[in-house]
């Protein structure tokens, strides 16, 4: 077994790195596919089969996470936000733009339009991640320069102010459960 920390070795474009990337991609696709299959089985009245799809999906999700960790793809929240923003940027500036052009050239105009629309959504995702990253980097996640509405995600209590309370005054849960609605 290769241990965590061999990221520099993987970065040399070894076959093992390619295998890890393929394993991550395959397991990631499988977890989504089995979730979709579970919905169909449940809708058709096959609850036991739906549960097996859901259970297998959870297994595949763990496998994907395991391979992603080996690739050292999980960092701090700030690193993860930056990586997510970069990924979303690639999707809207390159990937979906190219997909739309190809679909258009091949006569799939409706699909080309969907690619463009999803590209616009990916742009919004990038902007959201970059704003969140800025908040993390400037310690502005739980404190703002202007008055905000803060909501306890547990009980729904609302607080208005520049800073989220350290503890919800209603349910006593800590700051991590309070966010802007």
Description of each model-found segment:
Residues 1-10, 177-181:
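Single conserved hydrophobic/aromatic residue that forms the stacking wall/gate
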Residues 13-44, 52-66, 79-105:
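Alpha-helical bundle segments that constitute or directly flank the non-heme di-iron/ferroxidase center
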Residues 43-46, 101-111, 136-139:
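Inter-helical turn/loop segments and adjacent helix faces that build the functional surface
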Residues 70:
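Active-site cofactor/substrate anionic-group-binding motifs, chiefly glycine-
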Residues 73-77:
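Short domain-boundary/entry signatures in modular proteins, especially
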Residues 120-179:
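Cys/His-clustered metal-coordination modules, chiefly Zn-binding fingers
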């Amino acid at each position: 077994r290769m241990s965590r920390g061999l990221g520099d070795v993987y970065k040399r474009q070894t076959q093992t790195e390619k295998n890890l990337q393929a394993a991550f991609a395959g397991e990631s696709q499988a977890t989504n596919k089995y979730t979709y299959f579970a919905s169909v089985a449940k809708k058709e009245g096959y609850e036991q089969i739906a549960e097996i799809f859901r259970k297998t999906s959870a297994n595949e999700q763990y496998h994907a996470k395991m391979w992603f960790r080996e690739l050292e793809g999980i960092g701090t929240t700030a690193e993860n936000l930056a990586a997510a923003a970069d990924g979303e940027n690639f999707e809207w500036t390159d990937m979906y733009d190219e997909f739309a052009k190809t679909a258009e050239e091949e006569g799939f105009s409706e699909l080309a339009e969907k690619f463009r629309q999803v590209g616009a959504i990916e742009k919004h995702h990038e902007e959201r991640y970059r704003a969140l990253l800025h908040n993390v980097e400037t310690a502005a996640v739980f404190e703002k320069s202007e008055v905000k509405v803060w909501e306890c995600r547990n009980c729904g209590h609302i607080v208005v102010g520049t800073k989220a309370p350290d503890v919800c005054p209603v349910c006593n849960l800590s700051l991590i459960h309070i966010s802007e609605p």
